[in-house]
Structure formats: C-alpha cells, structure tokens
Amino acid sequence: VANGGHCILIPRFTPQSYAELIKKHKPNLIAGVPSLFEALLRVKEIEGADLSCLLGVFSGGDSLSVELKKRFDAFLKEHGASITVREGYGTTECVTASCLTPIHKQKEGSIGIPFPDTYYKIVKPGTQEEVPYGEEGEICLTGPTMMLEYVNHPEETAQTKQTHADGLTWVHTGDLGMMDEEGFIYFRQRIKRMIVTNGYNVYPSQLENILEGHEYVHLSC
C-alpha cells in the first residue's frame, strides 16, 4: 500500500467468493494460511482461472505440509503461474513476518531465511544455550520490529524477552525448529504440542506429512 499498491479486503471469507475475487481482480500477491490453499483446490469457481498474474504466493500462520505444497504448486503451474508457494514465519511479538523463503532457492520443509535486519538462533528449550546447526530447539529472534512489552504483564514480558550473553535481547517464541548450515529455518511445532513417547519427540506435523503422503488420505489434522 505504501508503494502505491491496492489491498483487496474481504468482509466475509468463503472459498467460493475468494476464488471469484482472484478471477476478477487478478492480484499479483496472495498471502494465506494452509487451509486457504486447501480450500482453493476444492472449489469449482477457480476452474479455468488464469493465474499468470501472480508474482508471489505466501503461506504462513501454520505448518504447510509437503504434500499440500506440492499439490498447490502443481495447481499454480496448471493455471499459468510461473511461481511456487513460498513459506514464511512471523509472530505477533515481532509485528509481522520475519523469515521468508527466498525466490531463488527453496528447501523442502523450510520456512526460509531471516530478513536482512533480523537474526535467528535456536536454543535448548528453557535456556539461552544455543544448539548446533541441525539440532532442534526453541526458535529465538531479534530485530527492529520486536515488541516493547506485553502491556501490564511484566512477568510474561520477562519470560518472552530475554537478554542473552551476546548483549542482544531475544524473543523466545515458544516454537520448536532448527537451523541448517546455510541459515535456513525449519519450523516444527509449538513446544506445547510436542508429544513425547518412549523417549522420542514426535510432532503432529510430521505425522500429518506421513498420513497425507498416502494415496487414500486427502487431508489430516
């Protein structure tokens, strides 16, 4: 909007009306949660749409399964788009997105790399101890969009915003993830949703990926 673009607001969302608006306005950018993309794959109103207008499609707000991404990428190609879904990540505590899959390189299961002015690290849950590349832990981030505080909630603020040994103040997101050696971030799950069984950490998103990879399973949750 600040650069002269138009933002199309939808008073009440339905997959059918959303599909019709895409065909009518031919937007360049679409951002949504995974359930939006799943819904668009199912509605007949999107059939025959020319999506060559799209320059970017962004997914966030929840885990995008590998299977759904493959299906929607194929859908985009079939409808004339030359792009694929790019995953991103953000939290309320940093205002908006702070991590995005670059257009020139994508890695399966990754939510991308931090914005240029934002830094990420992965720490052992419940500590400030940074873990090695490839090891899972809590996602922490810092940057210019970091919140000041939870208003009138100093204890919650102190738990979320912590000053580490490097002198920087970091937001502890409560999300599990990892970072590879190229700086790509992988979101796993909210820490509270992790299942521990027989000493192993099991994440619902991993189970969903396995289930949705079966030819007879359309959607799992």
Residue spans for each PLM region:
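Conserved ATP/PPi-binding loop(s) of AMP-dependent carboxylate-activating enzymes
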Residues: 113-117, 129-162, 200-202
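ATP-dependent adenylate-forming carboxylate-activation enzymes
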Residues: 5-25, 34-36, 202-207
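Acidic-histidine catalytic/liganding microenvironments
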Residues: 43, 154, 214-215
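A structural signal for short hydrophobic beta-strand segments in well-ordered beta-sheet cores
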Residues: 120-122, 161, 175-179
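AMP-binding/adenylate-forming catalytic core of the ANL superfamily
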Residues: 30, 143, 148-149, 168, ...
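Glycine-rich beta-strand-to-loop/alpha-helix junction loops that act as flexible
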Residues: 59-62, 89, 142-144, 198-200
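Gly/Ser/Thr-rich phosphate-binding loop
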Residues: 2-5, 27-32, 41-110, 116-119
